[in-house]
From Swiss-Prot:
Keyword line: ATP-binding, Chaperone, Cytoplasm, Isomerase, Nucleotide-binding
GO biological process: protein refolding
Reaction catalysed by this enzyme: ATP + H2O + a folded polypeptide = ADP + phosphate + an unfolded polypeptide
GO cellular component: cytoplasm
Record-given protein name: Chaperonin GroEL
Localization terms from the record: Cytoplasm
Subunit-structure text: Forms a cylinder of 14 subunits composed of two heptameric rings stacked back-to-back. Interacts with the co-chaperonin GroES.
Molecular function as annotated in GO: ATP binding; ATP-dependent protein folding chaperone; isomerase activity; unfolded protein binding
């Protein structure tokens, strides 16, 4: 086991504080509309340029181990805020630095750190309640576009594109961000349920221009096992052909004479059909087949349900307004499923999301919700160079997270003003003893810091602006750093999601409180480099 260094008291706290300052000073230059970029070295390829606080924080590792421990604790603030709200990482880092810095002064002067932490917790709890009072719902496309624009560094195009995507796929729909192939940003919306499985034979194609098989008002046969024998498939094919409608088969696989018969019947015009493999694998395949069944109002043919292919009747098949089968994707549009059953299925999947342990499982479950609820929108980010594309893509992803947070918990005035208003509302808060009151004062001072940093990054005098904003009568009165004017920030479209501001304050206070109550730090001793062996010195020959 390697030797350890044990550092006590003020010496430990000061070294931790140095690490906090180093990381925060690198991150906080990105805050606000006038914030600067940070260039990050990469072991291969061109360097990354970013204005995203958590990306900068994650890239920083300090040589001094004790300082690095302090930096890693603040990095946790940024990462936790990013996970919870998707944005506000720089604000959280700035708040954490201020709480730690002010708190260290009180601890050094003999104030009880445990009481300071209790005071901090009380102040944060009261401030969060005030933020919720200030908050207002974010419902209109204009408000969603404003949130997206502010988060994307005042890029209106991004905000409007996200608002349009949300309008088309709904607030529950999935919106993904991908690299574009042109200079312009593009939005593509896939309506209905789409999964990544295509036709099993190109002979199903009936639209040569688009290279797809289009089925209007099809019946949908869902089967959990392989379909190889024509005897299994023939009865249902005859029933569908009599009904004069197309047939879409979604099964584990369709092969041999079953596939050949489908192709021949399709080519002769006897039965318009297409066959695709079921999406997913194992239990996920079963779940997705059930999703399609509920969406289309059909049943899954499986041994578990006791339903066999020979006995399937038309009422047990799913139905849809339209189906499009391409080489790699299948889209089912406007399924005939019962709305109550679909909503119940969505509710059931949401419960699974809450219980899911891994991010991968949560992502896949969220995709299933989106496919049932509305659709999928893809934003393709365009740029002239790869470096610019990476930076822009990160901004668009931040903006997307921010708009989701705004829809969830509402919006507050941006530019650090919401924290100033919450601060004014709790300025007379008192606790059980003077040491706890010191914790309240620390939080009150920290809540000014994001506004001060935004103003400082814009090249203005922070104290003058902070004083003017604090004395404003209206809740949404503040300083618009992008335009360098005072006014109503809500009207100007300078807004932040309530969830982002709340998460930033809570996470910053949580980690800062732990650092203030730390009295001993234990870390690995630096390895001493072994001296290089020296060659023996030989005397000269006389």
């Amino acid at each position: 086991m390697p030797a350890k260094d044990v550092i006590f008291g003020d010496c430990a706290r000061l070294r931790l504080m140095e690490g906090v300052n180093t990381l925060t000073d690198a991150v906080k230059v990105t805050l606000g509309p006038k914030g600067r970029n940070v260039v990050l070295e990469r072991s291969y390829g061109s360097p990354a340029v970013t204005k995203d606080g958590v990306t900068v924080a994650k890239d920083i590792e300090l040589r001094d181990r004790l300082q690095n421990m302090g930096a890693q604790m603040v990095k946790e603030v940024a990462a936790k805020t990013s996970d919870n709200a998707g944005d506000g990482t720089t604000t959280a880092t700035v708040l954490a630095q201020s709480i730690v810095r002010e708190g260290m002064r009180y601890v050094a002067s003999g104030v009880n750190p445990m009481d300071i932490k209790r005071g901090i917790d009380q102040a944060v709890s009261s401030a969060v309640m005030e933020l919720k009072k200030i908050s207002r719902p974010c419902t209109t496309g204009k408000e969603i576009a404003q949130v997206g624009s502010v988060s994307a560094n005042n890029d209106r195009t991004v905000g409007e594109m996200i608002a349009e995507a949300m309008n088309k796929v709904g607030k529950e729909g999935v919106i993904t961000v991908e690299d574009g192939k042109s200079l312009a940003d593009e939005l593509e919306v896939v309506e209905g349920m789409q999964f990544d499985r295509g036709y099993l034979s190109p002979y199903f194609i009936n639209n040569p221009d688009r290279q797809v098989a289009v089925l209007d008002s099809p019946f949908v046969l869902l089967c959990e096992k392989k379909v190889a024998s024509i005897r299994d498939l023939l009865p249902i094919m005859e029933r569908v052909a009599k009904a004069g409608r197309p047939l879409l088969i979604v099964a584990e696989d369709v092969e041999g004479e079953a596939l050949a018969t489908l192709v021949v019947n399709n080519a002769r015009g006897i039965l318009k059909a297409a066959a695709v493999k079921a999406p997913g694998f194992g239990d996920r395949r079963k779940a997705m087949l059930q999703d399609i069944a509920i969406l289309t109002g059909g049943h899954v043919v499986s041994e578990e349900t006791g339903l066999s292919l020979e006995k399937v009747s038309l009422p047990e098949l799913g139905q849809a307004k339209r189906a499009e089968v391409a080489k790699d994707t299948t889209t089912i549009i406007d399924g005939a499923g019962d709305a109550k059953a679909i909503n119940a299925r969505i509710k059931h999947i949401r419960l699974q999301i809450e219980e899911a342990a891994s991010d991968y499982d949560k992502e896949k479950l969220q995709e299933r919700v989106a496919k049932l609820a509305g659709g999928v929108a893809v934003i393709r980010v365009g740029a002239a160079t790869e470096v610019e594309m990476k930076e822009k893509k990160a901004r668009v992803e931040d903006a997307l997270h921010a708009t989701r947070a705004a829809v969830e918990e509402g919006i507050v005035p941006g530019g650090g003003v919401a924290l100033i208003r919450a601060r004014n509302a709790i300025s007379n808060l008192r606790c059980d003893n003077p040491d706890q009151d010191a914790g309240i004062r620390i939080v009150l001072r920290a809540m000014e810091e994001p506004l001060r940093q935004i103003v400082a990054n814009g090249g203005e005098e922070a104290s003058v602006v902070a004083s003017s904003v604090a004395s404003g009568k209206s809740i949404s009165y503040g300083y618009n750093a992008a335009m360098r004017v005072y006014g109503d920030l809500m009207d100007a479209g300078v807004v932040d999601p309530t969830k982002v501001t709340r998460s930033a304050l809570q996470n910053a206070a949580s980690v800062a409180g732990l650092m203030l109550t730390t009295d001993v730090a234990v870390c690995d001793s630096p390895k001493r480099e072994e001296a290089a062996p020296t060659q023996p010195v030989h005397g000269g020959v006389g």
